[in-house]
Structure formats: structure tokens, C-alpha cells
Amino acid sequence: MELVMKDAECALTVSETTFGRDFNEALVHQVVVAYAAGARQGTRAQKSRAEVKASRKKPWRQKGTGRARAGSVKSPIWRSGGITFAAKPQDHSQKVNKKMYQGALKSILSELVRQNRLIVVETFSVEKPKTKLLIQKLKEMSLRDVLIVTEEVDENLFLAARNLYKVDVRDAAGIDPVSLISFDKVVMTGNAVKQLEEMLA
């Protein structure tokens, strides 16, 4: 199959297994959930009644005071007491096979092509690290919410884009399923497309 280049009067021949496969929603969902789970810190920690540092003495005698029974100031129903089911640090990561991850990326790329959300260009750069220059370039292409994927991240382009809302710059090796589905359009250079194809072959 062929992808038409927007800034050149030619087409780029690409593999149908990478850019023309059916959309596997279940697989994409599983990989995206696993990716998001892997990004969680999982460092939250609370103290149970056994871990709270406090007196072990019974606050008042069992009978005769007219007050409710109390055996410990560490009780979860007391202020400053322990947490009943205290959260502990845990690893939230989920196992995703390489084949599944690549399959999800191929599904997303193919769906972007079908929805005309993937724009292939020969090159994409700015002369200086100026946000104004990038805004002008994006306006000319009628783009606002966009992920720019190049073979290697150009420093000028990265600096120009980092202060823009809903604009991100990645190299082909650094893209992930969440980034691809988070933007309205994806602009990709021809070399980045070829590099992606080799990675997912």
C-alpha cells in the first residue's frame, strides 16, 4: 500500500501488515491499560494499627465510666489511629508480550491511516528554536492537536514545541500506544515511517 506525502508529489510504499491491518480493539485496550498501569508509582503507604507509634495502655477501665469500651488509642475508629486496610507499596505493572505490544501499535497506526489522522511529510523542522515559527508552520498545515514523529528529535523543534499545549515531539523509537491515540493528528516524516516499519517487522 502507499501513503501520500503531503509536502511532496510522491507516495511512500509501506507494508500492509503494519499500516493496513484490521483494528483489534481488545488488544489495543489491553496494551493501553497495561502501559498506564506500568506508569503508576505504586509507592503509597499507610500505617495499620500495628504500625502506629502510640501507648499500648488501655485508655480507661472496661466498666463503670459510662463511656464506650476502648482498648487502644491505635484503634482505626480513633483519630490518629491506624488504617483498617492500610495501603502498601505495590507493583502495578502488567505483563505484555512483545508480539502483543507490536500488534497494538500496528492496529493503532492502521486505524490512524483509515481515519485520515496520519499525515506523512518528507521533512518537518524549524530553523530556530522559536515557538512562534512552529505555530506558524502548524497553522499552514491546519494543525492544532498534533503529535510530531521524526527519525531523530531535532533540538530546535523540541524546544519550539515544549511550551505548546496539545503538541508533542517524539522520535520514531520513542512512540508508544498512549501517545498515538492521545492526539487528533499524527505528523510523521518519511524516514520515521520507514524506521517504524523496520521496528515492527
From Swiss-Prot:
GO molecular function, one term: structural constituent of ribosome
Functional summary from the UniProt entry: One of the primary rRNA binding proteins, this protein initially binds near the 5'-end of the 23S rRNA. It is important during the early stages of 50S assembly. It makes multiple contacts with different domains of the 23S rRNA in the assembled 50S subunit and ribosome.
Family statement drawn from the similarity comment of this UniProt entry: Belongs to the universal ribosomal protein uL4 family.
Protein name per its UniProtKB record: Large ribosomal subunit protein uL4
Matches recorded under HAMAP family: Ribosomal_uL4_B
Sequence segments annotated as region (Disordered): 44-73
Gene Ontology CC terms: ribonucleoprotein complex; ribosome
InterPro entries associated with the record: Ribosomal_uL4, Ribosomal_uL4-like, Ribosomal_uL4_dom_sf
SUPFAM superfamilies the UniProt entry points to: Ribosomal protein L4
